[in-house]
Amino acid sequence: MKNDTQEPGIPMGYEENFPPVDMKWHANATKRFASPFVDNPHDRIDVDAIILSHAAVACGWTIRDFYEKPELGIHCVCYASELYDLLPVTHWFYSLPWTRELGLKLVYKDTLPPISTGPIISEPGDVDKIRVVDKEELKKNFTQQEFYRLYDYVAKQIPMTLVPISYGFDLVGAAAELCGVENFIMWTFTEPEAAKKLVKTYTDTSVNGAAGLADKYGMAMLIVGSVLANNDIFSDESVEEYSAKMMRYYVDQSFRKGAGPQVFYHLCGNHETDYKVFKDNLIWSPFTVFHVGYKGKNVFPSKLLKEEFGSKATLMGSVDTKLMINPSPITVYNQSKEQLLGGRDAPKGYILGNSCECPPYTIPGCMHAMVKAARDFGTYGTW
């Protein structure tokens, strides 16, 4: 029997803290979500604000709760998606999956996702000490067990929102954490073979993680990005060599091992000129979403995104993440409008998103401004 006098807090049984999903809303959101992939426009252009810990904050918990209690975190995402009228599917992740298995120690913080306590190697010769972790070993270890537990919870409690997702995420950035970001950047100039081997070791481990998820659930959507590898740090040539080619390798190898066919490519940060190297390097399945955050200091224009990648994938345009904590919903609305007008007629469909993760303390009025703009300028049949 449930103890109604229990003090606020969450043991397990996270589902007891949330009302059931409104299935009328969910049915409409599902048709809307499928629109770009089945060429059957429904309702309006979708909004994917890349909600993570904001979902927990919006429901009254903390950033730390979101990451330390994945089942709670993903249920918060489910509830926040209905609250804001976003996507009908759930997700939960952080930026350093599979790194524990490679030897990195992660710690939880009150205001941050899990972060590394520091590099585990410091010399190029040490790269050989880090080995690829195979699929069966990963299945027994922390990251894969965490995802199994997470998706089993979703399958039981909110099954209509389940999409098993495996994260390669930032192949270059995660690999760089193993030796220290400053060391890694230097090695790309002085010890390029060591730097490349480190990225490949992390990538192969991530592929095995995707395969392990596909073994259990029959599929695994892939999310992979270029975050550290951007024009603020690297040349176009280096972004291509270290990131774009490895993203292709990650998707190709994951597909061959049963993952996919859904792919989300997330180019975070400044990709002012290096965006050009991705078109001919990436693998484009019929269920691909492609997203670029910034071009220089400004959000990447959806018009340019459409011109360059509209024939390749469903596109996700960007609203500047910084605006989401600025007390000016009209600014968010106007930028959303500009991006929608630039990308809404993309041949394979368009989604409106943030340039990066929705800030934990996003102003609800700013979130509403994005969705309102999508209704006002993204309703199918009105342009």
Regions found by a protein language model. Name each.
Residues E68-P70:
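Ser/Thr/Asn(+Pro)-rich, low-complexity disordered segments
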